[in-house]
Amino acid sequence: MTLLLDSHVLLWALYAPEKLLPAARQAIENPSNMVFYSAGAVWELELKAAKGKLSLPTDWLEAASATGFRELPISAADGVMSARLPWNHNDPFDRLFIAQTMTRRWKLVTRDSYCKLYKADCLTA
């Protein structure tokens, strides 16, 4: 199974795995699963840190890489798909994560309810 972690799930997986529901934690920690984070998650988290809404360790990206998580770049097709999704939800990062998982047929790991608004494959974190 291939997983894409929502921004908050990425941080939980790195620094607070006890916040994850058991099924999500098992899926993320299962060595047979491939675990990705979107370049959009990096953008979102760094924006929040720059605005003072979030405190990030300076080496958090290195920690993600050391854990074995892989970065998923944002493609032009991802941008088109996220813009063409029904407007059930307005957050551009959430829309991007939905688009990225739908086009690749991956599973999005999130605690947010927006995932239920689309025909995406989601695992509740």
What kind of region is each of these model predictions?
Residues W12-A13, K48-A49, L85-P86, Q100:
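A generic structural signal for short
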Residues M1-Y37, A50-E62, R104, S113, ...:
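Short, well-structured N-terminal submotif of metal-dependent ribonuclease cores
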Residues L45:
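Phosphate/NTP-binding elements of NTP-utilizing enzymes
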